[in-house]
């Protein structure tokens, strides 16, 4: 005895096609792609649109405060407070050519969503436990054609950061560079 599935096939194709058309836009707001979580590394996305420069930072919390759990001690709470102060000051985190006349406007910080655990203080982090800092820095550049380079000073200011992957998007195109303590300046054009 043969079972014929052909009469069901057109309906199945329509259902699958419907999912590809309707579902992705409905889920788009819930999906946010993040770079891999790597200790010692941060990701910067720098986009120049007209006169506005926006730099986004994504970093494991361990790079910023030295841990990835909810702060438990006065020292850890002080580190979180100092991180908020540092990441709120976009003037201190990035150097640019003075000829570009870029003026820092604002910073938006998204602190980590700490995972609460029953860890014992002084013990290593639980495997798989991750927390990230995200920040967005906005600048107005009155001579954007002169914005030829960017130096992420945060390589010196954030704990344990050895590398910054800088993704750059300008009217001239997109590309990526890696900044390290030995090679801090990245080309913007």
Locate predicted features.
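Bacterial N-terminal signal peptides that target proteins for export
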Residues: 2-14
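Compositionally biased amphipathic helical and low-complexity segments enriched in hydrophobic
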Residues: 6-9, 28, 189
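Cleavable N-terminal signal peptides
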Residues: 14-15, 26
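Sec/Tat signal peptide C-region and signal peptidase I cleavage site
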Residues: 22-28
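N-terminal soluble domains immediately following signal/targeting peptides that reside
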Residues: 30-189
